[in-house]
């Protein structure tokens, strides 16, 4: 938070959501987690808690210019934090079901 990304974090303002991405249809295209609504405008950090790893595909990717960065260790029980303004996606699940708990840590709106 404050030391790494210089964010002044307040806490959780939304309940985390359970997401399931099913084989052949589960994916989430490129997006950011910020938006114009009151809650979405104060999202500073997104997080994903990986609840299983017995699936194929379904990679969490972050857009970094022309390349896509794939954070390592997307394994059961691991927790990934990332700035909410980063463009990211989840690729198509090709086998099994991907289960993840997602949420956001909030702070004052970006200025």
Language-model segments: residues:
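Fe(II)/2-oxoglutarate oxygenase catalytic core
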Residues: 1-79, 85-111
């Amino acid at each position: 938070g404050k030391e790494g990304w210089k964010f002044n974090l307040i806490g959780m303002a939304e309940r985390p959501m359970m997401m399931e991405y099913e084989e052949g249809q589960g994916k989430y295209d490129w997006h950011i987690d910020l938006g114009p609504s009151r809650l979405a405008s104060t999202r500073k950090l997104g997080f994903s808690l990986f609840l299983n790893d017995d699936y194929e595909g379904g990679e969490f990717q972050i857009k970094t210019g022309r390349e896509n960065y794939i954070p390592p260790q997307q394994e059961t029980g691991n927790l990934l934090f990332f700035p909410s303004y980063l463009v990211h996606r989840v690729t198509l699940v090709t086998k099994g079901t991907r289960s993840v708990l997602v949420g956001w840590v909030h702070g004052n709106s970006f200025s």
